Amino acid sequence: MATIGSGSARVSDTTSTSSAYLMTTNPTATEGNRLLRGASANDASKVPVYHYPPEQDERSKKAPFIEDRLNEELTNPEYVNRLYERWYSEGLSSNEVALGLDQIDNQEVQETYQNLGLGYREYIDWRNSM
């Protein structure tokens, strides 16, 4: 991983899967733009404290932000393959999928959705060449 101010940047190989149609992931910043707001238990003035990564609820081990969940799920090759197969079996074209994924206003998942649409286009090409 790249270190700020180190002068040299190393990037780990994130494309370890052999399938060409899977979505490739690029290393990005580890922190999102969103923070959770909470109150410090030790502070009498109850000044809000912002923290990231957010503390996970004991009942749920999932990340609280949908963007984090989506990025985690959409980098799982098994999940992505099932998603592509479902779209393919429903007869959706890559343009229909791209238009559907393009309707999101959330900037944090927009790049993930664009990569997903490109991966589906490559999946269709791979399936049609079989």
Swiss-Prot record:
Name of the gene: RXLR-C16
Domain of life from the UniProt record: Eukaryota
Inducers of expression: Expression is up-regulated in spores.
Subcellular location: Secreted; Host cytoplasm; Host nucleus
Entry note about domains: The RxLR-dEER motif acts to carry the protein into the host cell cytoplasm through binding to cell surface phosphatidylinositol-3-phosphate.
Function: Secreted effector that suppresses pattern-triggered immunity (PTI) in plant host.
Region called Disordered, residue ranges: 1-61
Record's compositionally biased regions (Polar residues): 1-31
The name this protein goes by in its record: Secreted RxLR effector protein RXLR-C16
Family: Belongs to the RxLR effector family.
Keywords: Host cytoplasm, Host nucleus, Secreted, Virulence
Species annotation: Plasmopara halstedii (Downy mildew of sunflower)
Annotated Gene Ontology cellular component terms: extracellular region; host cell cytoplasm; host cell nucleus
UniProt keyword annotation of Acetylation present: no
